[in-house]
Amino acid sequence: MSDRRPIATLPDLLISQIAAGEVIERPASVLKEILENAIDAGARAIEVRLEGGGIRRIAVTDDGSGIPPEELPLALTRHATSKIRSLDELESVASMGFRGEALASIASVADLTIISRTRGAEHAWQIDGGSLQVSPASGPPGTTIDVRQLFDRVPARRKFLRSEATEFGHCVDAMERIALAHPEVAFRLFHHDRAQRQWLPADHGQRIRDVLGAEFVGHVLPVLAAAGAIALMGMVTRPTAARARADRQYLYVNGRFVRDRTVSHALRSAYADVLHGDRQPAYVLYLDIDPGAVDVNVHPAKHEVRFRDSGAVHRFVSQVVGQTLAQTGGAEAVPAGVPDGAAPDTAYAGEPAAAAPGLAEPRAPYPAAYPSPGQSPYQGSPARPHTQVPFRLHGEPAGIPATDWQSLYRPLPGDAAPAATALRAAPATPLPTADEHPLGQALAQLHGIYILAQNSRGLVLVDMHAAHERVVYEQLKRALDDRALPRQDLLVPVVFHAAEKDVALVEEHETQLNELGFEMRPSGPASIAVRSVPALLARGDIESLARAVLRDLGAVGVSRLLTEQRNELLSTMACHGSVRANRRLTLEEMNALLRQMEITERADQCNHGRPTWVQWSVNDLDKLFLRGQ
């Protein structure tokens, strides 16, 4: 057994190096801390120069308030800060930094120099992180922090760094996060003296476009809502623009970039009905909340926060984003990703306007360019009709068989000539205006799967099963919420063979099945009789529907099935109760489905996240036939 070592106080340098291990992981961590200090100093222009991906050098120059020469040594002292003075100030801190550890930690693992000049001072002053000697220097008002040879003093940490290109990429990511939070600040980034990024002061909408690109903004919906002391604004992507990776998710709480499980779960809940598979939403969201209601002193790098009332935050974010996604529809779908001034291209269900919607925020210093609550976020978007047209499937229409196409070209009988002349003389039916029917009027059915329709923009193609599935799903949700799910008694019960465990489920959960609109009873030791079903699903495949419900019931149990799994069950029911492929519809039925799509929330995607319709403009069709080329 080795000799016991006495307890001793650690030297300040080692303490700072230990603290640096929590905060300074890589060059991007250094850059983040320095940029946050510049923002806290009131900078309006920040220049960043990197060498070796930030490993060899990180120099940040700002035009902020500067540091007086007598305070420069304190700036490199641990737990010295101008941000807070008491616990009360800590609990309501609004600045980016507040611990007073960043510069001391950086100086312990790298060569650090600060040159700073306050406004009105005759010249700047310089301090070296090693000697802590303050000397006169030249420089404009503001502060320059120069960090060289990161982790040279801690070789064990340096070997964990990646290539220069990788570290440079992380530095760009860190700078983008800060730039998105502070659009009023101008940023310039140089790498090996070559300009890499430049963002001029702008509003939030323009800054998002500058940083993330026009393609990102071309697929977003604006978000703006406030309730009491909490407000949310920003942009969320439409479900059709979801990504395979969660790499475009930016959440800011009081201007601070964070990763929060509460808000992330709320966003996933809002997208639950419209995301396909494992796709990830993209968003830039700014959550504004009373600083006293959120604890930012949770994570060493301040990446996490703790809300005093996380449940209220979850409900607010989920409802706001859910309502935003629900308000999308055919009337608001226009081409995405179109260069400025170019003609529109094909627009998929739910794609946005070519011009990015402006952003505004609920309170100062946010700009006021956002639409008011309840107003359409897209200028010129047609109003939606509020009359519901019931969609009911009738008998097969009496159409001309495909094998008898020759009859279309037979000569008209003599008594039909006047009628034909009158038909040719009659004016063409005017196109439906966008205000009347955003999805237009049905023209025909294609292969028993798609509906072709004509609207004021051009041609609309609808997946009739996917569209009807969404319509039925939303109707089921509303009916179950209102405890008014109508039942349809079957004239002849549907009896099918079932496993003993399914028969037992029917006996055990008869009451819960009744709540869902089903009346099922055992008709033998291995058979079940279905006597009633939800009226919305009465025309579906009753046996398949009953088996699907029992399968879900056995998999998750009745308590979860009627709470968190409720929507999954209703989605299954809607899928089995929707019009199937190869079912021939009349024009009246097709138009009824289009009208219901226009008044149904989230009608742009089916319950599984796939698009329900696509739009081709007349210009798109002209291009196909080289018209005007």
From Swiss-Prot:
The lineage's top-level taxon is Bacteria
Listed HAMAP family: DNA_mis_repair
Give a short account of what the protein does.
This protein is involved in the repair of mismatches in DNA. It is required for dam-dependent methyl-directed DNA mismatch repair. May act as a 'molecular matchmaker', a protein that promotes the formation of a stable complex between two or more DNA-binding proteins in an ATP-dependent manner without itself being part of a final effector complex.
Q: What is this protein called?
A: DNA mismatch repair protein MutL
Give GO cellular component annotations, separated by semicolons: mismatch repair complex
What Gene Ontology molecular function terms does this protein carry? ATP binding; ATP hydrolysis activity; ATP-dependent DNA damage sensor activity; mismatched DNA binding
- Asked whether the UniProt record includes tRNA processing among its keywords, one would answer no
Which residues lie within the region annotated Disordered?
358-397
Q: What is the organism field in this record? A: Bordetella pertussis (strain Tohama I / ATCC BAA-589 / NCTC 13251)
Q: Does the keyword Lipid biosynthesis apply?
A: no
Task: Write the record's keywords in alphabetical order, separated by commas.
Answer: DNA damage, DNA repair
Q: Which family does it belong to?
A: Belongs to the DNA mismatch repair MutL/HexB family.
Matching entries from PANTHER family are given as:
DNA MISMATCH REPAIR PROTEIN MLH, PMS, MUTL (PTHR10073), DNA MISMATCH REPAIR PROTEIN MLH1 (PTHR10073:SF12)
Its GO biological process terms? mismatch repair
Q: Which Gene3D superfamilies match?
A: 3.30.230.10, Histidine kinase-like ATPase, C-terminal domain, MutL, C-terminal domain, dimerisation subdomain, MutL, C-terminal domain, regulatory subdomain
Write out the biased-composition intervals (Low complexity): 371-382
